[in-house]
């Protein structure tokens, strides 16, 4: 697969989700995203009130809910996400109950997903995170099918904060197979180089979450 630097930039979510990030870090991220041509930044919900400059510049603002462990009640996640949208978020990445994902409990997953989707009407882009590093292939497929049924826009591999690791080519391939092109697949967690990003796209990722957007794009072939 041949992918250009501009095409890669267009599918990156430039991520800043560490617990110690500051408003100055956010402003630097905004500057870098604009310079690199990356259209989306992903930031903590508590920083949504500092995104006016990014919104005015045309950046899409993504945030997270139930992050990073997914153990909030679904209605709490929904409220967190809805508040972020009121502050200007156009995309929300929600961590599912990972125990339910691992158990392939489609009823529990669908109930959670529907509650959150109902709180975030279109055109808000909704992504569900499954922590693929700790989930087997069958459970990944079940979660993806539930996400499709619930009206999600993306299934996402990882928070990037789980000690088991982040995205793998193998997990992306499973998610993409289950998604069947009906929803997107976001690969996130540990993607630091151009080669890694290309491998994820080749496996079926349609979005890449990374805090290393500059390094990835600077690694593009001349």
Curated annotation (Swiss-Prot):
Compartments reported by the entry: Cytoplasm
GO MF, one example: deoxyribose-phosphate aldolase activity
EC number: 4.1.2.4
CDD domains in the cross-refs: DeoC (cd00959)
GO BP term, example: 2-deoxyribose 1-phosphate catabolic process
Coiled-coil segments: none
Annotated pathway: Carbohydrate degradation; 2-deoxy-D-ribose 1-phosphate degradation; D-glyceraldehyde 3-phosphate and acetaldehyde from 2-deoxy-alpha-D-ribose 1-phosphate: step 2/2
Active-site residues, record numbering mapped to chain: 93, 156, 186
Pfam entry (one): DeoC
Top-rank lineage group of the source organism: Bacteria
Alphabetical keyword list: Cytoplasm, Lyase, Schiff base
Residues spanning the membrane: none
Top-level EC class as recorded in UniProt: lyase
Main location (coarse class): cytoplasm
Alphabetical list of InterPro entries matching this protein: Aldolase_TIM, DeoC, DeoC/FbaB/LacD_aldolase, DeoC_typeI
GO cellular component, one term: cytoplasm
Catalyzed chemical reaction(s): 2-deoxy-D-ribose 5-phosphate = D-glyceraldehyde 3-phosphate + acetaldehyde
Keyword Amino-acid biosynthesis: no
Function in brief: Catalyzes a reversible aldol reaction between acetaldehyde and D-glyceraldehyde 3-phosphate to generate 2-deoxy-D-ribose 5-phosphate.
PANTHER family noted in UniProt: DEOXYRIBOSE-PHOSPHATE ALDOLASE (PTHR10889:SF1)
Family membership: Belongs to the DeoC/FbaB aldolase family. DeoC type 1 subfamily.
Protein name per the record: Deoxyribose-phosphate aldolase
UniProt organism field: Corynebacterium efficiens (strain DSM 44549 / YS-314 / AJ 12310 / JCM 11189 / NBRC 100395)
């Amino acid at each position: 697969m041949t992918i250009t630097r501009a095409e890669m930039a267009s599918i990156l979510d430039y991520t800043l989700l560490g617990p110690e990030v500051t408003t100055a870090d956010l402003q630097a991220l905004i500057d870098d995203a604009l310079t690199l041509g990356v259209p989306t930044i992903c930031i903590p919900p508590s920083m949504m009130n500092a995104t006016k400059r990014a919104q005015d510049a045309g950046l899409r603002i993504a945030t997270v809910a139930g992050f990073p462990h997914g153990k909030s009640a679904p209605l709490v996640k929904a409220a967190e996400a809805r508040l972020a949208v009121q502050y200007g978020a156009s995309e929300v990445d929600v961590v599912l109950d990972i125990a339910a994902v691992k158990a392939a409990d489609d009823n529990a997953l669908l109930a959670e997903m529907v509650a959150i989707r109902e709180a975030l009407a279109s055109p808000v882009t909704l992504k569900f995170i499954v922590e693929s590093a700790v989930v087997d292939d069958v459970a990944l497929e079940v979660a993806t099918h539930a996400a499709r049924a619930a009206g999600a826009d993306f299934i996402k591999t990882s928070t990037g904060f789980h000690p088991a690791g982040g995205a793998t080519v193998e997990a992306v391939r499973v998610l993409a197979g289950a998604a069947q092109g009906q929803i997107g697949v976001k690969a996130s967690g540990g993607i630091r180089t151009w080669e890694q990003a290309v491998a994820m796209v080749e496996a079926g990722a349609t979005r890449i979450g990374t805090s290393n957007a500059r390094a990835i794009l600077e690694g593009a072939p001349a």
